A protein has these predicted regions:
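Bacterial N-terminal signal peptides that target proteins for export
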Residues: 19-29
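Long, amphipathic, charge-rich alpha-helical segments that form helical bundles/coiled-coils
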Residues: 68, 116-137, 169-197
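Bacterial N-terminal signal peptides
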Residues: 30-38
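Alpha-helical segments in soluble extracytoplasmic regions
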Residues: 73-163, 211
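Intrinsic-disorder-associated, low-complexity terminal segments enriched in Asp/Asn/His/Tyr and depleted
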Residues: 3-4
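Surface-exposed extracytoplasmic segments
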Residues: 63, 181, 185-188, 205-206, ...
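Bacterial Sec-dependent signal peptides at the C-terminal "C-region" and cleavage site
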Residues: 39-49
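A cross-kingdom marker for long, charged
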Residues: 204-232
Length: 232
């Protein structure tokens, strides 16, 4: 049974599955993704300032890191479900290391202090997800509700952070909706693990992956517009 749980994550994380199975994606997400790609390309052609290679490198970096975010958290959820404390401890450290890497990506743009603030916010996001996972396993609905409230307030905080550092290109509520939907995906996955809905889990993964790609692309586009000199 443990191998079946773990296999969901490993198969989902393989390049073959990642590239070959797109799953069911919300139409709005598809539209947004194409809009973001078009926007970056248009600015490069029109302004002549943005180097598409450097933008693509940043996009790949952020996509890989956000993919790592959902992959490592999935394993925390798995090990919570199977009550494997040793593996859960390792996975927990991996989640936080990944959050630090995401935050550090923004250090050249916003400085060390703001990078540390972002790390705190991402860690808080994870704490809410972990709380919901543990509450779901224990059947504690009151704790589940508290975790959902925590996720929602954290989405507001992450949105406020990015609006604060990049108000022109990430205005209020731009990031909040993306992070809120991302949190809902974690919740969905946790409940599917709890119910042992393996087929649904494999459908959920491509949706989660595509959504974190949209988060990464949104941040990449905003950075390239705010700091064209760093992408020239």
């Amino acid at each position: 049974m443990r191998d079946h749980f773990l296999g969901v994550g490993k198969r989902a994380f393989s390049l073959l599955v990642m590239e070959g199975r797109m799953g069911k994606i919300f139409p709005a997400m598809v539209v947004l993704a194409f809009a973001l790609v078009s926007l970056v390309g248009y600015e490069s052609r029109a302004g002549g300032e943005t180097n598409l290679v450097r933008v693509a490198e940043m996009q790949k970096t952020l996509r890989d890191l956000w993919l790592g975010h959902i992959f490592t958290i999935q394993h925390v959820v798995l090990y919570n479900t199977t009550n494997n404390q040793a593996e859960r401890y390792i996975a927990d450290k991996q989640v936080l290391a990944n959050a630090k890497q995401i935050a550090d990506t923004f250090t050249p743009f916003y400085g060390e202090a703001r990078s540390e603030k972002l790390f705190t916010l991402l860690s808080d996001h994870y704490a809410a997800v972990k709380d919901y996972s543990e509450a779901t396993i224990g059947g504690n609905t009151q704790r589940q509700d508290a975790a959902l409230t925590h996720l929602a307030s954290n989405a507001d905080d992450i949105d406020a952070f990015f609006t604060g550092v990049n108000p022109d290109h990430l205005p209020k509520d731009t990031i909040r909706g993306l992070i809120a939907a991302h949190g809902a995906h974690h919740v969905l996955q946790i409940n599917q693990y709890k119910k042992k809905e393996y087929a649904k889990l494999e459908e959920t993964w491509p949706m989660m992956r595509q959504h974190v790609y949209i988060i990464a692309d949104t941040l990449t586009t905003a950075l390239s517009k705010q700091f064209p000199d760093k992408f020239s």
